[in-house]
């Protein structure tokens, strides 16, 4: 059931998006702030469709949020000088191979995201979703002006896991660690 209204600030990423720093089951507090659910979405630079959708949503958020961005000032700051969520992994994470040849967006929310599998069935087993899986994300962009900081932020709505991936963060899966039989165990 789809309605005809298309929210210009909402994006569904492509299926090759990789999830990193996936705090999607329990909210996490950063520097004593409000606990939030969050994920870093790693988008291959080759996924130009998703990148263009994100750029358009950032522009729409800027236009919708001009009064908020203006605040008490006389004019709205240019989008070029504002903090925006689409970032270049090659420039900002040069030592992390997972971010090579990719853009990334950090999305968060105070509310838990819905998490489904490729067949749109809810995922209830926490071990199924980890940093390194591939999937689509429903995200929205919005303007903010808080404590002198102005920009466009990214909210996390829902996640759809499409495929398993190599776990990120150096932790291996138990089934991989013990995959090889040690024939000379007792010798």
Where are these regions (language model features)?
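Structured, beta-strand-rich domain cores
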Residues: 67-148
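Compact mixed alphabeta submodule
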Residues: 116, 120-187
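Residues in well-ordered beta-strands of folded domains
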Residues: 40-42, 106-108, 160-162
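OB-fold ssDNA-binding interfaces and closely related basic DNA-contact patches used
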Residues: 1-104
């Amino acid at each position: 059931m789809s309605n005809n209204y298309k929210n210009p600030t909402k994006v569904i990423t492509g299926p090759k998006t990789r999830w990193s720093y996936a705090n999607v089951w329990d909210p996490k507090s950063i520097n004593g702030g409000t606990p939030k659910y969050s994920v870093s979405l790693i988008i291959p630079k080759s996924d130009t469709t998703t990148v263009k959708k994100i750029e358009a949503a950032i522009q729409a958020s800027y236009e919708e949020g001009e009064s908020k961005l203006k605040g008490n000032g006389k004019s709205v700051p240019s989008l070029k000088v504002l903090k925006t969520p689409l970032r270049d992994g090659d420039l900002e994470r040069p030592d992390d191979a997972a971010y090579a040849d990719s853009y990334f967006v950090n999305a968060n929310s105070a509310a838990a995201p819905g998490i489904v599998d490729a067949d749109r069935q809810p995922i209830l087993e926490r071990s199924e979703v980890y940093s390194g899986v591939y999937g689509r994300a429903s995200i929205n962009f919005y303007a903010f002006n808080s404590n002198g900081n102005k920009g466009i932020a990214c909210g996390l709505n829902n996640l759809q896991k499409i495929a398993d991936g190599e776990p990120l963060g150096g932790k291996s899966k138990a089934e991989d660690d013990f995959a090889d039989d040690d024939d000379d165990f007792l010798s």
